[in-house]
Curated annotation (Swiss-Prot):
Protein name listed in UniProt: Polymerase basic protein 2
Gene Ontology cellular component list: host cell mitochondrion; host cell nucleus; virion component
Organism: Influenza A virus (strain A/Swine/Wisconsin/1/1967 H1N1)
Localization per Swiss-Prot or TrEMBL: Virion; Host nucleus; Host mitochondrion
Pfam families hit by this protein: Flu_PB2_1st, Flu_PB2_2nd, Flu_PB2_3rd, Flu_PB2_4th, Flu_PB2_5th, Flu_PB2_6th, Flu_PB2_7th
Gene: PB2
Length: 759
């Protein structure tokens, strides 16, 4: 108090005021504090002090030519004294105003291109609709979300290379643009930004926004795609939320959504094939999403979802260390356990072998619609605190936690036998057996669990076996909370291994993911997914299988034709014919196959009966294991459009229609491609034309290796002999002429010789 009084007295004296306002500061410590280092110690004060001066800005001397000395009001815009210590001119802030009003105007054509993300945001907000505001206490949980809509998915390093190449193409430094997306973006941006006068640094910043995914760990209730996150401050507060529908979609959200759908389809399909891992990789490598290879997206996109993570693990990429069970992501937050095999008896006296986790552990469980904290000991649930959107979601979380706890009363609650199978008809492991059982009906589980009286704890209430909330009693150890559990925030990724059956394990051998965890939910992808693998033809139904099978034969006709005559068994075993078998009535498969194979053998034996169209038409039927029978067929049945449709052995049908005039094939009315050669063109035409320069020596001679296709003949050296397959499926021996002079007569001789060789 004394000090304050003393200060007041001092301030009342005019000399004190003068010392403080007029005299210079000459205490070395103070001068040091404010002048050492290049960092401004008090930017706000510095700005005020500078702007109070008449000429606070310095500019290049050229400014004198472009700005008048005085403005319309006669105020001086720049000083004739140059800046101390440099040859720059001192300029008044009024000069900036003059420049903004009267200075040269540049082309604005590049602004929407450089500031694309801002322009697009304005459009989305313009077309978005804001609904009513609701005041309520909502459960927000922190999730890792994407905060800049409309970006590509490049890694920071890839983006840096693209930005350097676009903005500073002449700078030194090794830049390697490898991925397809890098090259595409670089080309597009270079074209867009020709003659661009916007400062390169600004362009670089804006490009970074466009190319790299930026994520933040934010409290969210509701939509997590980037078009919702950009308006988070408008749609949810501490105790209110406002409904909002975005006025547009952005590619990065669509990529994530479509990636999940593609990955789920691929994992589901791979599970039922003979070698799930090999099939999964083949499909990932041959699939495109929105025109970009799926493997490129998997490498760059941080989307975390069970099927996506299985695909990433198969490609040898790192994934999150959390594990999945019952559609919930579990992350162990404390404790540890050891695993031990144990046999237990269900309520139906069925023996199950389960891997028991011995020890005390705590987990967070995060699902789409519910989150929970789980504390468990060996085969005992200690505490479960759940929060969720509705009763159904809360029930799902409770069931998963009860099964995960491996408690005896849960196993004893099983009624009936457990015999759930996966898509490949293999029995599920015991933990998933139990899970499926109680997901179907959890009534007995909840009733057998036991209830207990509860204390009154802020923000927590009990839940009874019929899922009604209560403040007095609750299922043992289970409580409902208003607060959500935050998603696991770390972006740490770990090395994992994957086995043939797509089970993903961490380096300690814990199973993180398996195909049982992949959701069965079907959605409609936002971007076009193109599955080139024959394994995925059936995704779009029987018609797609039919059309794709025939398109594949036509596309690969040159090699198919050679295999047909030389190594038919290998051809029949091709995986491309697998999906087709599901269209052929089960009872008829073997007989059709036997019949077609016999027919083909006759074509090979009886020269001149080769028939391109018929081979293409019947080939898929020959792929099934054949049954020997004397049966003859005039048509073969395929199950499409909900009923059996016929393919005629001789002639066209709605299923398989070949137009001789246009040489095009239509399957179920869809174009399946053009055939290279007309089966009826006799021996002249194509062969004789192509065989110019070759001498036909006679029938096939096996010593000269397998038959080449006509296109492969060009690689022969002069005088070299080879077997060649000609249009009728016949193989002849030819020799490349040593001289070129007689080429003209070759085509006539060839025609005669082929006839002789065949007859």
């Amino acid at each position: 108090m004394e000090r304050i009084k003393e200060l007041r007295d001092l301030m009342s004296q005019s000399r004190t005021r003068e010392i403080l306002t007029r005299t210079t500061v000459d205490h070395m410590a103070i001068i040091k504090k404010y002048t050492s280092g290049r960092q401004e110690k008090n930017p706000a004060l510095r700005m005020k002090w500078m702007m109070a001066m008449k000429y606070p800005i310095t500019a290049d001397k050229r400014i004198i030519e472009t700005i008048p000395e005085r403005n319309e009001q006669g105020q001086t815009l720049w000083s004739r004294t140059s800046d101390a210590g440099s040859d720059r001119v001192m300029v008044s802030p009024l000069a900036v105003t003059w420049w903004n009003r009267n200075g040269p105007t540049a082309s604005t054509v590049h602004y929407p291109k450089v500031y694309r993300t801002y322009f697009e945001k304005v459009e989305r907000l313009k077309h978005g609709t804001f609904g009513p505001v609701h005041f309520r206490n909502h459960v927000k949980i922190r999730r890792r979300v994407d905060i800049n809509p409309g970006h590509a998915d490049l890694s920071a390093k890839e983006a840096q290379d693209v930005i350097m190449e676009v903005v500073f193409p002449n700078e030194v430094g090794a830049r390697i643009l490898t991925s397809e997306s890098q090259l595409m973006i670089t080309k597009e941006k270079k074209e867009e930004l020709q003659e661009c006068k916007i400062s390169p640094l600004m362009v670089a910043y804006m490009l970074e926004r466009e190319l790299v995914r930026k994520t933040r760990f934010l409290p969210v209730a509701g939509g997590t795609s980037s078009v919702y996150i950009e308006v988070l401050h408008l749609t949810q507060g501490a105790c209110w939320e406002q409904l909002y529908t975005p006025g547009g979609e952005v590619r990065n959200d669509d990529v994530g959504q479509s990636l999940i759908i593609a990955a789920r389809s691929i994992v589901r399909r791979a599970t039922v094939s003979a070698d799930p891992l090999a099939s999964l990789l083949e499909m990932c490598h041959s699939t495109q999403i929105g025109g970009v290879r799926m493997v490129d997206i998997l490498r760059q996109n941080p989307t975390e979802e069970q099927a996506v993570d299985i695909c990433k693990a198969a490609m040898g990429l790192r994934i999150s260390s959390s594990f999945s069970f019952g559609g919930f992501t579990f992350k162990r937050t404390s404790g540890s356990s050891t695993k031990k095999e144990e046999e237990v008896l269900t309520g139906n006296l069925q023996t199950l072998k389960i891997r028991v986790h011995e020890g005390y552990e705590e987990f967070t469980m995060v699902g789409k619609r519910a989150t929970a904290i789980l504390r468990k000991a060996t085969r005992r649930l200690v505490q479960l605190i759940v929060s969720g959107r509705d009763e159904q979601s809360i029930a799902e979380a409770i069931i998963v936690a009860m099964v995960f706890s491996q408690e005896d009363c849960m196993i004893k609650a099983v009624r009936g036998d457990l015999n759930f199978v996966n898509r490949a008809n293999q029995r599920l492991n015991p933990m998933h057996q139990l899970l499926r059982h109680f997901q179907k009906d959890a009534k007995i589980l909840f009733q057998n669990w036991g209830i207990e009286p509860i204390d009154n704890v802020m923000g927590m209430i009990g839940v009874l076996p019929d899922l009604t909330p209560s403040t007095e009693m609750s299922m043992r150890g289970v409580r409902i909370s208003k607060m959500g559990v935050d998603e696991y925030s770390s972006t740490e990724r770990v090395v994992v291994s994957i086995d043939r059956f797509l089970r993903v394990r961490d380096q300690q051998g814990n199973v993180l993911l398996s195909p049982e965890e992949v959701s069965e939910t079907q959605g409609t992808e936002k971007l076009t997914i193109t599955y080139s693998s024959s394994m995925m033809w059936e995704v779009n139904g029987p018609e797609s299988v039919l059309v794709n099978t025939y398109q594949w034969i036509i596309r690969n006709w040159e090699t198919v034709k050679i295999q047909w005559s030389q190594d038919p068994t290998m051809l029949y075993n091709k995986m491309e014919f697998e999906p087709f078998q599901s269209l052929v009535p089960k009872a008829a498969r073997g007989q059709y196959s036997g019949f077609v194979r016999t027919l083909f053998q006759q074509m090979r034996d009886v020269l001149g009966t080769f028939d391109t169209v018929q081979i293409i038409k019947l080939l898929p039927f020959a792929a099934a294991p054949p049954k020997q029978s004397r049966m003859q067929f005039s048509s073969l049945t395929v199950n499409v459009r909900g009923s059996g449709m016929r393919i005629l052995i001789r002639g066209n049908s709605p299923v398989f229609n070949y137009n001789k005039g246009t040489k095009r094939l239509t399957v179920l009315g869809k174009d399946a491609g053009a055939l290279n050669e007309d089966p009826d063109e006799g021996t002249t035409g194509v062969e004789s034309a192509v065989l110019r320069g070759f001498l036909i020596l006679g029938r096939e001679d096996r010593r000269y290796g397998p038959a080449l296709s006509i296109n492969e003949l060009s690689s022969l050296a002069k005088g070299e002999k080879a077997n060649v397959l000609i249009g009728q499926g016949d193989v002849v021996l030819v020799m490349k002429r040593k001289r070129d002079s007689s080429i003209l007569t070759d085509s006539q001789t060839a025609t005669k010789r082929i006839r002789m060789a065949i007859n």
